[in-house]
Amino acid sequence: MQASAITTAQRLSTLAILYEQGQASKLMDRTLDKLLAHEAEQARAQLEVLQADLAEFEGQYGMASDDFYRRYQAGQTDDRMDFVEWAALVQMAARLRQRLRVLVGGNGP
């Protein structure tokens, strides 16, 4: 099988098998640690930008994003474009927080 035909999932599965068999090298460990740390840092940076955007909406409308999102989900807000954008940002931030929890082993924000 050519390297280009091997999917990322297959390559990760191969690494998992090597780890399970105790055949992982220190280089593999260091590389994976660096990769996870890099991905976590990228997620933190993206979350920081989103949190600044959320803070603008919170200041503009005098409401915490969590409270807004509960009301939005319950249909207690109108359909103005600001609210649609705010809701999307809340969802994006939640996904990034979940990603961080996975990347850092459950100790994310």
Predicted segments, located by residue:
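Small, basic N-terminal interaction modules of short regulatory proteins
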Residues: 1-59, 63, 98-109
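Short E/K-rich amphipathic alpha-helical oligomerization segments
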Residues: 55-77
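Short His/Asp/Glu-rich catalytic/ion-coordination signatures at enzyme active sites or charged loops
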Residues: 35, 71-85
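Short, surface-exposed linear patches
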Residues: 71, 92-94, 109
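Short, compact, well-ordered microdomains
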Residues: 79-105
